[in-house]
C-alpha cells in the first residue's frame, strides 16, 4: 500500500541535452514550463566571475564562455575517466575534464577560483533547476521525484543518478527506464482498449538510445526485452557535422579549427542546421569572424547530412533486432512503433524504422520531447498514493537490462539473474569452496553478457570469512541476488553450516560517492543555491538603483518640470544623479547593501526637492508620476476604477 506523501511528487526526465519536469494534477499530467516559458530546459550549467547560470541562461552564453559552460554530464555519470567513450568525448568538449581517482571531474573557473565538480554534482544542479521550476508552478515545496534513466544504464550509472537526486535535496522515489516511461505516456489513455498490444518504443535522444518491447493490456505494462546504446544520440550527429565543416574550413582557408579551442559557435550552428534539415532539403551556415577574422559561409543538404551519419543511423536498427530476438517476436507481431526523443524527428531515422517493419508507419501521437517526463509524472503519482481512477490500476513490470552474476573458478561468469528478467527479482544459488580448508570466499559481482568475467563490468566484491575447515566442495554457500524496482542490486551470501552471512548493496567502490561525499555535496549545493539567491537580490538592488537614477534624470529633462524647478535645486539633483550613475559604472559587482545605501543617499537629495516641487505645483505636474515612488513606479490612482497604467506611444 502506498502512503500519501507530504508534498507533491514530480516526474523528471534528466536528459543529456535537455531536461523536462511534469506533475500529475487534476487527473492529467501537466508538463511545467520554466522561467523562460520553455517546456524543456537545456542541461547546461555556466560559471562566471560573479554567478552560476543553469538552463537557458547557461546555454545562451556558451559562445562567450565556452571553457566554463558544462553540458553532457549524462555521458560521464557512473563512468571511469579511462573509459574509451569518455576519452573520445573529451575531444569534442570545450570545457576541461580532469582525472581524480579514476573518476572524471569537470574543471571550471568560478568566481576567480578553479573548482571541480563530479558528474553527480553537475546533474544535481540540473535536478535542482527542475525542482525549482516545479515549485514555482505548484507554489509549494517539492521533495519527492521519480527520475528517469536510459534502460541500458548499468548499476553504477543508476546509483550515480540516485546520488544526484540526493544532492539536489530530492527523495528519489524510484529510478525508472526512459522507454518504459514513454510507454506509459503512450498507453495511459488506451487502458480501455480491448486485447493485448505489443508496443516497440524507439527512444533516440540527445546522447543515449534505447529500444524496449512491451506488452500493454488492461493497464499492465510488461517489458519483454530491452536493448540500446548509452552513447548514441544527437550529440554524435552534431559531432559529424562539426568535423565535416572543420575539414571544409581547412580546405578553403588552410586553417585548422580542431582541438580544444574549436569555436563553440560552429557547434551551435551545426545543431541549428541539423534541426532545419528535418524539415528542409538544404540549409546554409553563416558565421561572421569564425576564426582569425575569417567569415565562414557554407551550405549543406539533407542528403549530405544523411551520408555523414549513415553508419550511426543504421546502427539504431541493431538493438531493434536484438529486442525482437530476445522477446521471440516477429516483426509483424508488433502492433505499434512509438518514436520518442528529439532525434526521431530526423526523416532518415523514421524511414529506416518504417522500412525495417515492412513499411509500417511509426506512431507519432505523443510529444517526443515530453513523453518521458509525462510517464515519470504518472509513476510519481502512483508512488505518491494518488487515488485517481486513471492511475489506480496501472502496473509497471520492467526488466534487468544486463545479466548479473558472480565469478566462479577460472574466471567464469555465472549469471544468477539473466538479462530481461522481470524486476523486482530475487534469485539464490548454492556454491562451494575450491580448495582444501578454504577459510573464506571472495564474492565478486559482475554485470554483462560475456562468458569470462574479465570481459564484463565488475560491480563490487565482498568476503565471507570464518568458514570451518573442510575439503573442497563440502561447504554450502548460498548467494542471493535481489534486484529492486530501480534496477539496483543487493547481494548477500550465507554459509549454511554456521549461518555466518555478509551482504552489500552494490556500490561500485571505485566510482560511487561515499555517504560523507554526498553529505558534503548536499551542503555545497545549498551554499551555491544561497549564493545564487544572493546574486539575484544583488542584481535586483543594482537594477532598482539604476532605474531610479534614470527615472529622476528623465523627470528633470521634462520641459513641464524644468520650468517649475528652482535652478539651484535642479543643479543639486543633477549633480547627485551624475555621481550615482558614475558610481554605478565603476561598481557593477557591488554588494546588495551598497546599492541600497546609495539609493537611500540619492533619495535623501531627491525627495525634499521633488516634494517641494509638487507642493508648489499643487500636485503632480501633467504627465508626471505623482509622488515619484523611489522604485520609479506610479502611485496608486485616486480613481481605483480606472486604468493604473498609462499607455505610452
From Swiss-Prot:
One term of GO molecular function? ATP binding
**Keywords recorded for this protein, A-Z:** ATP-binding, Chaperone, Nucleotide-binding
Q: Which residues cross the membrane?
A: none
Q: Which gene encodes it?
A: HSP70
Acyltransferase among keywords: no
Q: Which family does it belong to?
A: Belongs to the heat shock protein 70 family.
Low complexity composition bias: residue spans: 638-649
Span list, region Disordered? 617-649
* Name recorded for this polypeptide: Heat shock 70 kDa protein
Keyword Membrane (UniProt): no
A Pfam family that the UniProt record links to this protein: HSP70
- Tell me which InterPro entries the record gives: ATPase_NBD, Heat_shock_70_CS, HSP70_C_sf, HSP70_peptide-bd_sf, Hsp_70_fam
UniProt xrefs under PANTHER family: HEAT SHOCK PROTEIN 70KDA (PTHR19375)
Amino acid at each position: 500500500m502506498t502512503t500519501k506523501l507530504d508534498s507533491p511528487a514530480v516526474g523528471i526526465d534528466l536528459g543529456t541535452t535537455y531536461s523536462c519536469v511534469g506533475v500529475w494534477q487534476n487527473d492529467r499530467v501537466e508538463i511545467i514550463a520554466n522561467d523562460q516559458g520553455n517546456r524543456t530546459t537545456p542541461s547546461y550549467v555556466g560559471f562566471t566571475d560573479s554567478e552560476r547560470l543553469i538552463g537557458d541562461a547557461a546555454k545562451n552564453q556558451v559562445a562567450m564562455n565556452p571553457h566554463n559552460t558544462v553540458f553532457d554530464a549524462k555521458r560521464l555519470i557512473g563512468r571511469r575517466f579511462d573509459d574509451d567513450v569518455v576519452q573520445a568525448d573529451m575531444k569534442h568538449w570545450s570545457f576541461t575534464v580532469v582525472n581524480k581517482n579514476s573518476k572524471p571531474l569537470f574543471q571550471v573557473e568560478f568566481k576567480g577560483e578553479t573548482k571541480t565538480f563530479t558528474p553527480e554534482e553537475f546533474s544535481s544542479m540540473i535536478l535542482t533547476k527542475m525542482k525549482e521550476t516545479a515549485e514555482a508552478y505548484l507554489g509549494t515545496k517539492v521533495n519527492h521525484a521519480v527520475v528517469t534513466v536510459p534502460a541500458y544504464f548499468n548499476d553504477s550509472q543508476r546509483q550515480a543518478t540516485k546520488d544526484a537526486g540526493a544532492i539536489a535535496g530530492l527523495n528519489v522515489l524510484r529510478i525508472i527506464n526512459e522507454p518504459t516511461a514513454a510507454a506509459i505516456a503512450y498507453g495511459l489513455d488506451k487502458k480501455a482498449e480491448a486485447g493485448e498490444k505489443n508496443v516497440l518504443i524507439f527512444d533516440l535522444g540527445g546522447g543515449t538510445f534505447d529500444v524496449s518491447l512491451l506488452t500493454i493490456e488492461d493497464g499492465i505494462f510488461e517489458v519483454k526485452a530491452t536493448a540500446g546504446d548509452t552513447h548514441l544520440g544527437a550529440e554524435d550527429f552534431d559531432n559529424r557535422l562539426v568535423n565535416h565543416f572543420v575539414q571544409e574550413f581547412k580546405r578553403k582557408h588552410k586553417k585548422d579549427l580542431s582541438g580544444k579551442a574549436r569555436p563553440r559557435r560552429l557547434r551551435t550552428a551545426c545543431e541549428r542546421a541539423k534541426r532545419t534539415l528535418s524539415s528542409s532539403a538544404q540549409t546554409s551556415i553563416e558565421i561572421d569572424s569564425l576564426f582569425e577574422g575569417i567569415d565562414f559561409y557554407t551550405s549543406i543538404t539533407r542528403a549530405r547530412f544523411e551520408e555523414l551519419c549513415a553508419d550511426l543511423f543504421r546502427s539504431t536498427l541493431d538493438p531493434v533486432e536484438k529486442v525482437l530476438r530476445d522477446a521471440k517476436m516477429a516483426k509483424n507481431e508488433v502492433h505499434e512503433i512509438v518514436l520518442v526523443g528529439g532525434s526521431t524527428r530526423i526523416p532518415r531515422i523514421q524511414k529506416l524504422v518504417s522500412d525495417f517493419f515492412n513499411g509500417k508507419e511509426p506512431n507519432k501521437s505523443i510529444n517526443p520531447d515530453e513523453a518521458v517526463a509525462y510517464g515519470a509524472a504518472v509513476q510519481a503519482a502512483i508512488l505518491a498514493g494518488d487515488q485517481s481512477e486513471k492511475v489506480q490500476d496501472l502496473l509497471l513490470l520492467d526488466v534487468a537490462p544486463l545479466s548479473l552474476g558472480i565469478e566462479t573458478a577460472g574466471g567464469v561468469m555465472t549469471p544468477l539473474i539473466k538479462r530481461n528478467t522481470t524486476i523486482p527479482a530475487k534469485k539464490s544459488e548454492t556454491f562451494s569452496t575450491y580448495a582444501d580448508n578454504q577459510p573464506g570466499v571472495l564474492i565478486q559481482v559482475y554485470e554483462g553478457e560475456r562468458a569470462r568475467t574479465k570481459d564484463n563490468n565488475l560491480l563490487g566484491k565482498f568476503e565471507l570469512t570464518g568458514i570451518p575447515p573442510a575439503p573442497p566442495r563440502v561447504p554450502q554457500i548460498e548467494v542471493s541476488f535481489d534486484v529492486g524496482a530501480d534496477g539496483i542490486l543487493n547481494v548477500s551470501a550465507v554459509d549454511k553450516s554456521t549461518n555466518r552471512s555478509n551482504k552489500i548493496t552494490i556500490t561500485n567502490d571505485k566510482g560511487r560517492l561515499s555517504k560523507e561525499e554526498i553529505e558534503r555535496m548536499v551542503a555545497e549545493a545549498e551554499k551555491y543555491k544561497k549564493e545564487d539567491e544572493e546574486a539575484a537580490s544583488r542584481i535586483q538592488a543594482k537594477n532598482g538603483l539604476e532605474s531610479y537614477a534614470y527615472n529622476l534624470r528623465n523627470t528633470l529633462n521634462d520641459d513641464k518640470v524644468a520650468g517649475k524647478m528652482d535652478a539651484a535645486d535642479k543643479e543639486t539633483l543633477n549633480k547627485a544623479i551624475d555621481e550615482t550613475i558614475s558610481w554605478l559604472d565603476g561598481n557593477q559587482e557591488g554588494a546588495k547593501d551598497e546599492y541600497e545605501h546609495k539609493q537611500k543617499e540619492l533619495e535623501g537629495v531627491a525627495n525634499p526637492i521633488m516634494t517641494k516641487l509638487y507642493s508648489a505645483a499643487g500636485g503632480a505636474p501633467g504627465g508626471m508620476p505623482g509622488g515619484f515612488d523611489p522604485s520609479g513606479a506610479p502611485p496608486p490612482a485616486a480613481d481605483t476604477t480606472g486604468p493604473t497604467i498609462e499607455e505610452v506611444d
